[in-house]
Each structure stands twice: as C-alpha cells, then as structure tokens.
Amino acid sequence: MNNPTKSVTIEELKTDNGIFCRQTYTSTSQDCLVLVMGYGGSLRIWPATFVNRLAESFRVITYDNRGTGLSIIPQKPEEYTVKVMADDLFDVIDTLGINSHHLLGYSMGGCMALQYAHDHQDFVKSLFLLSSTAGGDLYAKPDRAISNALANPEGKTLWDIYMSTFSLMYAPEVLQRCMPTIEAIYEVSKECPTRPIALAGHSNAFRGFDGTSYLPGIKVPTTIVAGKNDRLMPVQNSMNIAENLSNSSLVLLDDCEHGPHIQNEDEIVDLIFKSAAKC
C-alpha cells in the first residue's frame, strides 16, 4: 500500500474537562475512527504514517490520555482508573458532537475501549482490540522481569528511556527495522514526556481493570489482533477475549510482537479498512 498523497487536515482542541484531542482527515474521510493509546502514551505515540493513511477513509480522532501530552495531569494515582479514562474518551466524543464511530484500542487502550464499548455500545460501529486484554481472570501475565522493566525504564536521557521501552516491544532485528518510525515518534513527543505520577496512575488503572463481565454483553463486530511473539501482552490474552466475545474474529500475526501497527503497518491498515467496510 502506498503512502497517502491526499492533503491532510489537522484540527486540535481541549475539552472543558482538560482532555486534548486531535482530528485528522482528508477530502475522502467518511466515518470517524477513534484511536485509544495505551500505558503512558499520548496521541503523539501513534505513528503519523499510520494515522495519515487511515485518514484516507476515516476522520481519525486521537487524544492525550489523562496524565499525558497536553491533557490534565491528576496528582494522585487513584485518580487514574480505566473507567475514568473511558469517561475522558466520552468527553472527547461528546465535545466533538460524534454519535457513531469505529473504535480501536491498543494495549491498555484496549481496556479503555472495552470499558467504553460497555458503557456506550450504541455509539460504537465496530471495535478493534490490538495487543490487549480483558483483565481479571482472563489476564495472562508477561514474565515478571518484563513487567518490572516496563514499569521502571532505564536510561540517563529521554531517548534512552524510549529505547528501553521499545526494546521490550521488539526483538533487536525488528527494532532496527522499525527505527525510522520510532525516531519520528520520539521527535514529536519529546517536548511533553509522560511524568512519573502519570505512569504510577496508569499502572493503578491497569491493575484495577477487570472487564471480563462486560464481554457477554458487547455485541458490536470486534476484530482482535495480536502478534504471536508479544512479550508484553502475551497472545493468550487476545485468545481469551475471542473465546468470550461472541461477535468477534481473531487475527494472530506470525513473527509479530507488541506493536503490530508499527511492525506490520500495511497489514493492520488494510485489516482496519476491510473490517470497518463490513459494518
């Protein structure tokens, strides 16, 4: 798939509750697609190439989770829960006047997407869960060393910390291949890094999430995608969701890890287009 050649328009605003959001679209954008970033990530962590290619068909909505980017930064970890963060998403949707949209959640963002789909199912045309989990008894944990390294990234510089995290996501040879995208992400996000209090809050939110009881009631068409070699969110998590979500399809990617939209961008963009077209 070629890179988009259409002119991309970007509009930004902050809701009254302090959530910063962005709309990216082209002359051919139609339905809205909302992207929900995961642990510690602002909207700048979405690769521009990924967003711009999606904008050829969708009006793409991205936003800074609380504690990240230009959004509010609550100072107590207990002020961060998946429920509250899903409410932040609805604040964005309500502010933009959107009443129907596709929804994609990545990693911990998939937890927020599940919560949102449970709370506002009538708004969701289709759901994409990318490298995510339902939590609770369906959560398959990564190795403890991986979890500890994610929670405590090492490095003397911000770049070192970024690389510490991305090295958990990808094997060395994959990391090298994805380096141009990673460097681009760093350049657009380095001016507003996520603070330690927000990382503690996001950890609190993830630990407290249990969406297992939501799965039987979610009826929207759902595409579940995972890399078979994911070390951060073991593939069993996606398999567990698929087994308990009736209107779902499971796509497992060979030789893919915890960032299919970066490692396998062409395949993921094509999958989103095809899945959304069925709804």
Where are these regions (language model features)?
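Conserved alpha/beta-hydrolase catalytic His-Asp/Glu region
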Residues: 138-139, 160-214
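Short beta-strand/loop motif that positions the catalytic acidic residue
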Residues: 218, 224-226, 230
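Conserved alpha/beta-hydrolase "acid-adjacent" motif
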Residues: 231-237
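Catalytic histidine-centered segment of alpha/beta-hydrolase-like enzymes
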Residues: 253-269
